Amino acid sequence: MGEKPWQPLLQSFEKLSNCVQTHLSNFIGIKNTPPSSQSTIQNPIISLDSSPPIATNSSSLQKLPLKDKSTGPVTKEDLGRATWTFLHTLAAQYPEKPTRQQKKDVKELMTILSRMYPCRECADHFKEILRSNPAQAGSQEEFSQWLCHVHNTVNRSLGKLVFPCERVDARWGKLECEQKSCDLHGTSMDF
């Protein structure tokens, strides 16, 4: 065995870290620019390399707006919005012909959410909805439509407007991923 048997695993982890750093930089609006005299060197989150760390422009970090986000605890509304965004995005990426395991995973996820959701009142309501309307995950369309109807059930109980489920794909369509890397086809460590 080589001098560093963990090297391949750590290299994969470094690739993942770099990918996450790149996506976060893109998300918050930092451009990846080559180092200049105005840049300050900052340590990367993870590095296996002994070469100098990536340089970023500290002035660009200081000028980022906070986008009207409070610094207090997450509200029920924020949590709900984030959860629905995640679930609808998951449904949009769900395969048209899921495996038995994928169908089982969706149903388990819904059950786990109904037990572990941080808002107890919301979790109990979701549990009631699941009892009368179990998760449907036979295809991408079926899962997306089921989720839309469940979301509308929650919205009605909150006195909110309902969403026209025939427009669910237009609202929550596939992510824009290179080479369809976002599609649910199993697990991979290739980044």
Swiss-Prot record:
Under catalytic activity, the entry for this protein gives: 2 R'C(R)SH + O2 = R'C(R)S-S(R)CR' + H2O2
Q: Which residues bind FAD?
A: K76, R81, W84, E121, H125, C148, H151, N152, N155, K160, R171
PROSITE patterns given in the database record: ERV_ALR (PS51324)
The ERV/ALR sulfhydryl oxidase domain sits at 72-172
GO molecular function ontology, one term from the record: flavin-dependent sulfhydryl oxidase activity
Q: Which cofactor does it need?
A: FAD
Q: How is it modified after translation?
A: Contains three disulfide bonds; one catalytic disulfide (Cys-119 to Cys-122), one structural disulfide (Cys-148 to Cys-165), and one shuttle disulfide (Cys-177 to Cys-182).
**Phenotype reported upon loss of the gene:** Embryonic lethality when homozygous.
SUPFAM superfamilies from the UniProt entry: FAD-dependent thiol oxidase (SSF69000)
Q: Where is this motif: Required for dimerization and substrate specificity?
A: 177-182
Q: Name one Pfam family in it.
A: Evr1_Alr
State if Oxidoreductase is listed as a keyword.
yes
Q: What does this protein do?
A: FAD-dependent sulfhydryl oxidase that catalyzes disulfide bond formation. Oxidizes thioredoxin in vitro. Required for the import and folding of small cysteine-containing proteins in the mitochondrial intermembrane space, and can act independently of the oxidoreductase MIA40. Can oxidize the cytochrome c oxidase assembly protein COX19, a typical substrate of MIA40.
Assembly mode: Homodimer.
Its name, as the record gives it, is FAD-linked sulfhydryl oxidase ERV1
Q: Which organism is it from?
A: Arabidopsis thaliana
